């Protein structure tokens, strides 16, 4: 977790980092919690302002509810949400938006389920370094999100039925100042439904060096680094979906600077996650396939994540992440810290839920290939 804690939290406690050698007083074995801190810990929640115990906030159809609003400088350190709603697909229908420093365009604009990891509209218990879904449908995010002037969080009900109960607890710190190189958290959502296959002539070698027809995970411009990706896959064809190699293009390079060996390898698994008959879900600090159902079959589902906490992918001008041909219907998110900037709207609600409601075998003329990611950028 040093990629986030080192970039943001340490600077708040001690001031900006310098290149000078540490003094003898700074060379100590003490953890941060044993040292004096210079921030104020606070929380905004949905608690009952009357003093009663009715802490829920209903969100009517088509309405937006503000759940957080504070002046900076500061850092959001933890977001907890839980929802009771009659619609089975409310995780796809409720959109989370986060705004920094008064910018009218959100830096995060993602369906709630896709942001927290249950990206196929299904709650499942898992844990990782930055996101988790606890038992009884509690959603948690532990990415540090700094802001200089202000931070604002809203949720919008884009479904067709009222959300009866929306609860929130958002922990944050107010700090005297932030380091000059502080970056802002962004999350970019994309989906492809269905994701068409790439066809090769009969007998031709399946060569792909430049990613011209690859599936796009994420594209952005500016300066920052990629912290991680979440991916949701809904298969619309038989057999293994995950042989696509990831390709990472940095700062407008025409050729990838990083090329991987397959989708399950990028998510730090192997061998088709165990295959059609032996797949077992797993969830670790920095990688996981926390939901696997009916693998390698039409209607099969996968929820995956990968955090680059130990080695974020840095860029100065632009970043593109592609995958070799992808079979299934897809949705994905990328998390990146960077200056305030690029916005990408999620697709309309009917398209977000389409893959969950209607899985069909593709035309026999289409040879499906694999992959569907969800990305969360933190810039």
What are these regions (language model features)?
Residues 1-14:
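N-terminal export signals
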């Amino acid at each position: 977790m040093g990629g986030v804690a080192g970039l943001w939290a340490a600077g708040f406690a001690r001031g900006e980092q310098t290149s000078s050698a540490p003094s003898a007083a700074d060379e100590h074995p003490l953890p941060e919690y044993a040292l004096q801190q210079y921030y104020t810990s606070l929380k905004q929640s949905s608690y009952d302002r009357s003093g009663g115990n009715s802490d829920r906030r209903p969100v009517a159809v088509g309405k937006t509810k503000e759940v957080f609003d504070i002046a900076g400088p500061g850092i959001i350190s933890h977001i907890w949400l839980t929802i009771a709603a009659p619609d089975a697909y409310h995780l796809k229908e409720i959109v989370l938006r986060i705004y920094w420093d008064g910018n009218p365009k959100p830096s995060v604009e993602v369906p709630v389920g896709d942001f927290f990891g249950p990206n196929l509209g299904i709650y499942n218990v898992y844990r990782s370094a930055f996101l988790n879904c606890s038992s009884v449908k509690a959603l948690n995010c532990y990415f540090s999100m700094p802001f200089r002037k202000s931070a604002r969080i809203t949720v919008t009900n884009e479904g067709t039925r009222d959300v009866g109960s929306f609860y929130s607890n958002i922990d944050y710190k107010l700090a005297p100042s932030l380091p000059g190189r502080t970056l802002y958290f962004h999350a970019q959502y994309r989906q492809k439904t269905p994701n068409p296959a790439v066809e090769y002539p009969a007998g031709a070698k399946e060569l792909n060096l430049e990613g011209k027809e690859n599936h796009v995970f994420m594209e952005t411009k500016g300066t920052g680094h990629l912290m991680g990706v979440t991916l949701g896959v809904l298969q619309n064809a038989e057999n293994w979906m995950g042989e696509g190699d990831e390709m990472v293009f940095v700062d407008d390079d025409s050729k990838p600077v990083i090329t991987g060996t397959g989708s399950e390898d990028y998510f730090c698994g192997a061998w088709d996650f165990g295959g059609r008959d032996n797949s077992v879900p797993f969830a670790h600090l920095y990688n996981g396939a926390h939901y696997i159902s009916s693998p390698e079959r039409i209607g099969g589902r996968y929820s995956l994540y990968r955090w680059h906490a130990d080695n974020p992918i840095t860029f100065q001008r632009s970043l593109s992440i592609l995958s070799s041909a992808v079979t299934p219907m897809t949705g994905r998110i990328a998390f990146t810290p960077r200056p305030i900037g690029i916005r990408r709207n999620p697709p309309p609600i009917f398209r977000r839920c389409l893959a969950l409601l209607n899985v069909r075998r593709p035309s026999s003329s289409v040879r499906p290939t694999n992959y569907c990611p969800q990305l969360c950028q933190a810039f």
